[in-house]
Structures are given as structure tokens and as C-alpha cells.
Curated annotation (Swiss-Prot):
It holds the Pfam family zf-RING_2. Gene3D superfamilies: Zinc/RING finger domain, C3HC4 (zinc finger). This is E3 ubiquitin-protein ligase RNF12-B. GO terms for biological process: embryonic axis specification; protein ubiquitination; ubiquitin-dependent protein catabolic process. Its EC number is 2.3.2.27. Residues 1-10, 110-138, 147-163, 383-392, 428-452, 467-476, 501-517 have a biased composition (Polar residues). Coiled coil: none annotated.
Length: 757
């Protein structure tokens, strides 16, 4: 009973508070209308043009009067803003400004006077950096804002981001893996994991391939054969480094150098994991089967089934079951490598067996984005057939990887992560270890010593694309990049972008596997942009959110809410925002640093929209069809997920709820209309419409916009169609629309209307 009473009291209090807030809002609205009605034309236009009226009910009459006085006297804000800009340039900007939309608007408006400035700050676990570039000739400037979410391991992950961003750049696995090993090493965890991944890559995969119990036998055969296959299969390992560069053939010639005992020793050490892997062998047999039907009967059947689909793979699978001996495998491996290029497409189409899927899941787990990133190059150079397929299509890779396993093991060293077909991985590991041996035995040793690190090490390599997976604890923080372009708007100028009303286009770019939302709007949903001060109109040119990175970091709900709040505060002044939402999978390796560091250069971002979001993730061999989503809520679609799976492995994009940042779209207030017809009138066009004061005949008439009766003192605006409205109501409407709210007739004849397109 007591609980019921308390509940009743609580609900009563809540309803009372709601009632009171509604009453207060109504009072403020009434005061707003009275204030506007009492303004003369000059004062009204002054406040309207400077966006000082705000929204009815959200501001008191006293505040409106204060704003009017300030604008008449000449706002002191410019000086404070300038000082703000100066402090920003000196790096003294207080973090408070970042959370205040007005302060940023003021700053934006003053930047054109102060020149290039940079602001940075930190709020809690969120660090931000704002950079502006001014064109002294035109007065236009571009503004870039980056928000980074730092976690406990955020600092470590940040460097990894930079490296990872660069990592994608190298096309060759060798380059990327080695470079990563070198670059990643800088991050304490990353270096080891990265180095290990390269050499560990195989060892690691070997460890996981351990599931490749078969690989174990394979690994041993390889290690045994490695002496032999080292020449033959080792070449593949070298090819792994080189394969990255795409030269698999070279791997054959270099086998001798690769054969360096390291590959053999590493395989030996790998064998230890192999013993461990044997348990795993059951899960990974799928991929292993092809390489070594002996290790696991299951794997043998799978290989057979998979191989059958893959004509090339079959030969390998045949050798695997029949010629379990490594010797046979080596030859097939080389053959596969040569044939691989041809098989790539085939395998992709083929790899679809349940086993492959298992391998795929497994691959996702152990696979790291870097590897994936590296994989694409490897695919080209190395047994691009199996590994390329694996890298680009984990599914395909998984399916064909088994078949390729032996071949890919060598080539797959780089793509072993993706394939994660344990057998392949081992072979790759062996080969890779051998290749690594040539590169650096220490790395291979590391791999051997830490086979388990394969998952983590692979992740490190993947770090560049999705650090969260790569470093485990050291996940790279999500980055939000906002690109704004501020233009000087002169009287008479009327371009589509300058229109307060806007149109939004939604398009997807298949080649980049990206989801893109593009808006061109010169104003905002509200009648007048809050940033329209002193003749400056601010609009968002692009906003890019790296969905992939966000997903990989696995943000907690609390963190995402905090970021959303911060973004909303920052965006408040920008009204309706247009944004680009790129899937990180389409990351362009050529522009790795744009997204990762909080200090990304705004100019680059502006010029290369995709570069910002671009994470060092390898583009899947077969581009995933871009997915369009409403307000970004459904960005994670099957296609996107497929893409994500290929590049990031463990992370899945299936649940849209797992993309907390996508909900940020609601703050951007996207207009979903796809019509390209111009909408909205300029202030000059609106002012040219006739107006009149309230008359006795208007006593019982009602404004159709606010649904409020006209009262004495009201100012009415009359449209050509003879319909009348409150001046402030219809002005707001016409800023976004060009038709009468009642009859929907065009307010301006097409001939008299300036071209908006």
C-alpha cells in the first residue's frame, strides 16, 4: 500500500511539474508574440537577420529585449571572440567553449577576422581539436572539428591509430606487416603484437590453426618439409612478405633465403601450438582439411567438398588427403600460388561451405583489420587466389583457404589472419616465419614463443583499421570529424547552398563500399541560422563518422551517451546539419592519418571527404554494395556487415543498436526529402512580400501556421495568393518553403525567382 501511495504521489508531482512547465512555456510564447508585434520593421529585420528571435516559448521577453539592445549598441562579442580566437591560437582555449554551441558560433564568426586558429581541449575522456583556415580574399573559411574518445588504453591506441592509418597505405603485406611491425612496435602492445602478427601471424594463426590440428601435422610436415618446402613452401613465406607486394613468384625464387632455419625452427615452436591447436583443430578443420586431410577427418571431407567447388583447391585438397606429406603440398602450394590469381574469383564464389563459415567466424575472431588490410595486397601478390579471397572475402577465404591452405599458408601468411584456416595459418606461419626469419628471426621467434598472441598480434596488425580488435585492451578511440564551411553571404547572392531551405540527397558509393548522406543546404530548418550574424552564414559541408572504428571500440552505452551530449552541445548552434557517414571499411589507405589523429588537417578532410573516415582497413576484394540508411539508424546492414566481417573479423555490424553513434543522426536533423527542387526564399524575397497591421476585420481570423487568432497589434504578411499569416510565422515557413501553407501555390513565379539550382 505504501509503495502504491508513493507511486501515486510521484506521478502526481510529475504531472504537476509538467503542467507547470507547459504553462510557463505558454507564457513565454505569449510574451514572444507581444514582443514581435511591438517591433518596428527595422528592429524586426535586425533581430531576424541576426537570428536573435529564437523559437517562441524558448526565450523570455526580457532576453529578447536584451538581445535587441545589444545588437543596436553593437555586440561586444567580436572582441571577446577575437580574444577567444587568440587564446585558441595559443592553445589556451578553455574546454568550456567546446560544449557551448554559441561560443563556437561566435568563434566561427570571428575567425574570419582573426585568421587561422586552432583550438583544443578535453572534457572527461573526450578530447577535441578544432582547426580553421581562412581565405583572406573571399572571407570564406573552413572549420574542422575532431572529437576523440579516449579510454584507459586510449593513449596507447591513439598512436596505433596513426600507425594503423599508415598501415593500410602499404599495399604489400610485406610492407604493411613489416611496416606495422616497425610502426606498431611504437605502441608497446602493438609492436609486439604487430611484429608477432607478421611472423606470429602464421605462428599465431598456427596457434589458432592449432585448431588446425591437421595444420599441426601440416605444420610439422611443413616444418619437416619446410626444409624441402622451405625451399618450395618457404618461398611462399617470402612471397608472404613479397606477396604483400604481390610478387608471389618471387617467393619461389627466394625460398632459399626464406628457408633459413628460422622458418623451420619457428614451425617447430609452432608445432607446440599445434599440439594445443589440435583441440582447435576441430573448429578450424574446415580450413585445415584442405591443407591436411590427415589431421582431421572432418577437415578432409570439408576440403573435399570445398575443393570440389574450387577446381584449383581440389588439387590441393587431393594432395592434402592423399599426399598428406608436406612434400606434395609444397608443390601444390606453389601451383596454387600461380593459379591463385585465377582462383581468387572462383574461390570467392565457391567458399560457402558451413565449414568455411566456421572458419570465417574463427577468422573474424583471430583476424585483425590490419591483416585484412594487408590481405588485399597479399591477395594480389601472393597466392592471391586463396588469401586474396580470404582477405577480401573472409567467407570465400575460409572456404577456399582450406584448399589454399598449403599454398596460402605460404602466401596466406599475410592473409592467414583473415583465412584463419588454422592449417593455412600454420603453413603461412611457417612460411611467414621463414620469411620473417629472413626479415628478422627475432620476430619469428616471438611468434613461436607467443603463438597465442596470434589473435592479439593479428589484431595489432589490424590495429590500423580497427584498433579495438587489434590491441585488445588498447583499442583505438572512435573519432568524430566535423567539417564546416563558412561563406560570406552578400545581398543579392542566391545560390542553392545559400538557401535557408535545403534539399538533401542520399546516395551510396559502390566502389568505396560507403554509405553516404549528402546535403547541400545554406541554412537550417529553423527560419534563420543561428550562425547568421554579421552577414556570415554557416553551414555544414560534411560530417563523417567512422562507423567501423566506433564499432570496433565497442563503446559502452554511457560513453556513447556522453559523446552524443557533447556533440549536441557543439552542434546546437549549427541548426540543421548535413553529414557524410562513411563506413570505415572503405578506408582509403592513401589517407591514413586523416581520421586517426585528433589533429587531422581540416583542409585534407574537406578536400578528401572519404579520407577522414578512412581507417586503415583493407578494402574487400569484392566491394560490398553500399547501404543507405535512414538517419544512419540502419547503416549496419548485411552488406555492410559482410564488408565489416571481411575487414574487421570479430566485429559484426548486424545490430544497428551496436552502432551508438548512428543515433547521432537525430541531432543532425536530416531532411529526408530527395527532391532536388529549390525550396525556401531569401530574406530579400520574403521582405518584398506585402505586410499590414491587424485590423478590425481580422478579429475572428486565425493564423494557419501557429493556429492562433490574430490580436490587436499583430503584423500580418500577405502572400500573392491572398492568404495571410503572422509575419514571424510565415517568414519562418518561407525560409524553408516556397509555397503557401494553405493552397500550396508558389509564392514566387518561376520567372521572377532567382535560380536556386
Amino acid at each position: 500500500m505504501e509503495s502504491a501511495d508513493s507511486t501515486g504521489k510521484g506521478s502526481t508531482e510529475q504531472s504537476e511539474s509538467q503542467r507547470q512547465s507547459q504553462m510557463d512555456r505558454l507564457d513565454r510564447e505569449e510574451a514572444f508574440y507581444q514582443f514581435v508585434n511591438n517591433l518596428n520593421d527595422e528592429d524586426y529585420r535586425l533581430m531576424r537577420d541576426n537570428n536573435l528571435l529564437g523559437t517562441p516559448g524558448e526565450i523570455t521577453k526580457e532576453e529578447l529585449l536584451q538581445r535587441l539592445q545589444q545588437i543596436k549598441e553593437g555586440p561586444p562579442q567580436p572582441s571577446t571572440e577575437e580574444t577567444r580566437g587568440d587564446s585558441v591560437s595559443t592553445g589556451e582555449d578553455p574546454a568550456e567553449d567546446s560544449s557551448n554551441g554559441d561560443s563556437i558560433i561566435d568563434w566561427l564568426n570571428s575567425v574570419r577576422q582573426t585568421g587561422n586558429t586552432t583550438r583544443s581541449g578535453q572534457r572527461g575522456n573526450q578530447s577535441w581539436r578544432a582547426v580553421s583556415r581562412t581565405n583572406p580574399n573571399s572571407g570564406d573559411f573552413r572549420f574542422s572539428l575532431e572529437i576523440n574518445v579516449n579510454r584507459t588504453s586510449g593513449t596507447a591506441s591513439m598512436p596505433s591509430l596513426d600507425q594503423s592509418a599508415e598501415m593500410p597505405g602499404p599495399e604489400d603485406m610485406e610492407v604493411s606487416s613489416q611496416g606495422e611491425a616497425e610502426n606498431v612496435p611504437e605502441p608497446e602492445t602493438v609492436p609486439e603484437s604487430i611484429r608477432e602478427p607478421e611472423s606470429v601471424d602464421e605462428p599465431v594463426s598456427v596457434a589458432e590453426p592449432v585448431s588446425v590440428a591437421e595444420p599441426v601435422s601440416v605444420a610439422e610436415p611443413e616444418s619437416v618439409a619446410e626444409p624441402e618446402s622451405v625451399a618450395a613452401s618457404v618461398p611462399v613465406p617470402e612471397s608472404v612478405p613479397e606477396p604483400e607486394s604481390v610478387p608471389e613468384p618471387e617467393s619461389v625464387p627466394e625460398p632459399e633465403s626464406v628457408p633459413e632455419p628460422e622458418s623451420v625452427p619457428e614451425p617447430e615452436s609452432v608445432p607446440e601450438p599445434e599440439s594445443v591447436p589440435e583441440p582447435e583443430s576441430v573448429p578450424e578443420p574446415e580450413s585445415v582439411p584442405e591443407p591436411e586431410s590427415v589431421p582431421e577427418p572432418e577437415s578432409v571431407p570439408e576440403p573435399e567438398s570445398v575443393p570440389e567447388p574450387e577446381s584449383i583447391a581440389e588439387p590441393e585438397s587431393v594432395p592434402v588427403p592423399e599426399s598428406v606429406p608436406v612434400a606434395t603440398r609444397p608443390a601444390p602450394v606453389e601451383v596454387t600460388v600461380e593459379e591463385a590469381p585465377i582462383q581468387r574469383g572462383q574461390r570467392r564464389a565457391r567458399s560457402r561451405s558451413p565449414d568455411q563459415r566456421r572458419t570465417r567466424a574463427r577468422t573474424d575472431r583471430s583476424r585483425s583489420p590490419l591483416y585484412q588490410t594487408v590481405d588485399p595486397p597479399i591477395r594480389r601478390a601472393q597466392h592471391s587466389s586463396s588469401q586474396t579471397v580470404d582477405a577480401s572475402n573472409t567467407e570465400e577465404a575460409e572456404g577456399s583457404s582450406r584448399t589454399r591452405h598449403h599454398v596460402s599458408s605460404q602466401v596466406h601468411s599475410s592473409s592467414s589472419n583473415e583465412t584463419e584456416g588454422s592449417s593455412r595459418t600454420r603453413q603461412h606461419i611457417t612460411a611467414r616465419q621463414q620469411a620473417l626469419g629472413t626479415e628478422g628471426q627475432s620476430q619469428s621467434t616471438v611468434h613461436l614463443s607467443n603463438p597465442e598472441s596470434r589473435s592479439s598480434s593479428q589484431t595489432p596488425q589490424t590495429d590500423s583499421p580497427s584498433n579495438a580488435e587489434t590491441t585488445g585492451t588498447g583499442q583505438r578511440p572512435p573519432t568524430i570529424v566535423l567539417d564546416l564551411q563558412v561563406r560570406r553571404v552578400r545581398p543579392g547572392d542566391y545560390r542553392q547552398r545559400d538557401s535557408i531551405a535545403n534539399r538533401t540527397r542520399s546516395r551510396s558509393q559502390t566502389p568505396n563500399n560507403t554509405v553516404t548522406y549528402e546535403s547541400e543546404r545554406g541554412g537550417f530548418r529553423r527560419t534563420f541560422s543561428r550562425s547568421e550574424r554579421a552577414g556570415v552564414r554557416t553551414y555544414v559541408s560534411t560530417i563523417r563518422i567512422p562507423i567501423r572504428r566506433i564499432l570496433n571500440t565497442g563503446l559502452s552505452e554511457t560513453t556513447s551517451v556522453a559523446i552524443q551530449t557533447m556533440l549536441r552541445q557543439i552542434m546546437t548552434g549549427f541548426g540543421e546539419l548535413s553529414y557524410f557517414m562513411y563506413n570505415d571499411n572503405d578506408a582509403d589507405p592513401n589517407n591514413p592519418t586523416a581520421v586517426s589523429p585528433p589533429a587531422a588537417v581540416p583542409g585534407e578532410v574537406q578536400n578528401n571527404p572519404s579520407a577522414e573516415v578512412r581507417a586503415p582497413i583493407a578494402e574487400p576484394a569484392e566491394p560490398v554494395a553500399p547501404v543507405e540508411s535512414d538517419e544512419g539508424s540502419n547503416v549496419a546492414t548485411s552488406a555492410t556487415r559482410r564488408e565489416g566481417r571481411n575487414s574487421r573479423g570479430g566485429v559484426t555490424l548486424e545490430e544497428s543498436g551496436s552502432l551508438p553513434f548512428l543515433s547521432l543522426a537525430q541531432f543532425f536533423l536530416l531532411n529526408e526529402d530527395d527532391d532536388d527542387q529549390p525550396r525556401g526564399l531569401t530574406k530579400e524575397q520574403i521582405d518584398n512580400l506585402s505586410t499590414r497591421n491587424y485590423g478590425e476585420n481580422d478579429a475572428l481570423k486565425t493564423c494557419s501556421v501557429c493556429i492562433t487568432e490574430y490580436t490587436e497589434g499583430n503584423k500580418l504578411r500577405k502572400l500573392p495568393c491572398s492568404h495571410e499569416y503572422h509575419i514571424h510565422c510565415i517568414d519562418r515557413w518561407l525560409s524553408e518553403n516556397s509555397t503557401c501553407p494553405i493552397c500550396r501555390r508558389a509564392v514566387l513565379v518561376a520567372g521572377n525567382r532567382e535560380s536556386i539550382v
